[in-house]
Amino acid sequence: MKHSKKLLLCISFLLITFFISGCGFMNKDDSKETEIKKSFNKTLSMYPIKNLEDLYDKEGYRDEEFDKDDKGTWLLHSEMAIQRKGEDLETRGMVLKINRNTQTSKGDYITNKITYDNKGRPQSNKKKYPVKMENNKIIPIKKIEDSKINREINEFKFFAQYANFKELKDYKNGNISYNPNVPSYSAEYDLENTDYNVKQLRERYDIPTKQAPKLLLKGTGDLKGSSIGTKDVEFTFVKGKQENIYFSDSMNFMPSEDD
């Protein structure tokens, strides 16, 4: 009888220890998820930025990588990638550097089609069209004969101009990853097609699937801030060997480069 009581007490102790440990891990995950959200929210809370020229007056995170007199540069990148089943992967997007020192913004509209040669090796067919921003409008720097490309540039909007992450704090049950050695971190969430940002993407792009996407927030560098780190936002609708549909976006603040 005494042995039974001791055994029962031992089992109870182990169960309590396991439960407390489990709660500890949950709290650690919850804490890291909160840290990741706060880190991303420093930039995402600025969305939507309808007039990108407002960024000339907005400063991001500064550290020792910046020269004393450097006001910094915002680097924006938005890109849509679509590969219908069995077809080539096509991407269309834009990169823009908004230099706060010179009050000028230049970049490229970039198209690419990934094809495969007879040995199955991927071949990039990337084309860049230099652009600049004037009066909050993106315009080509050089004359472009292709009317379709001209129209795409004139109608292009960065994700930062129409996205809204006011509900970021409400995203729950994320798949959290953190590696302090790199350092790198990420949080992934299952979204619904009713999500505001998903609806915005569907309005602007011909997305050939009704499948709701996963949202991935991934970054490198110190969670508290780093000018040499990056933060990327990805919406993945379909991911496979022969079919891929995803949208990627980033807005990072970095030291300015000499022209």
From Swiss-Prot:
<keyword id="KW-0564">Palmitate</keyword>
<dbReference type="GO" id="GO:0005886">
    <property type="term" value="C:plasma membrane"/>
</dbReference>
<protein>
    <recommendedName>
        <fullName>Uncharacterized lipoprotein SERP2465</fullName>
    </recommendedName>
</protein>
<keyword id="KW-0449">Lipoprotein</keyword>
<keyword id="KW-0732">Signal</keyword>
<feature type="lipid moiety-binding region" description="S-diacylglycerol cysteine">
    <location>
        <position position="23"/>
    </location>
</feature>
<dbReference type="InterPro" id="IPR007595">
    <property type="entry name" value="Csa"/>
</dbReference>
<keyword id="KW-1003">Cell membrane</keyword>
<dbReference type="Pfam" id="PF04507">
    <property type="entry name" value="DUF576"/>
</dbReference>
<feature type="lipid moiety-binding region" description="N-palmitoyl cysteine">
    <location>
        <position position="23"/>
    </location>
</feature>
<feature type="signal peptide">
    <location>
        <begin position="1"/>
        <end position="22"/>
    </location>
</feature>
<dbReference type="InterPro" id="IPR038641">
    <property type="entry name" value="Csa_sf"/>
</dbReference>
<keyword id="KW-0472">Membrane</keyword>
<comment type="similarity">
    <text>Belongs to the staphylococcal tandem lipoprotein family.</text>
</comment>
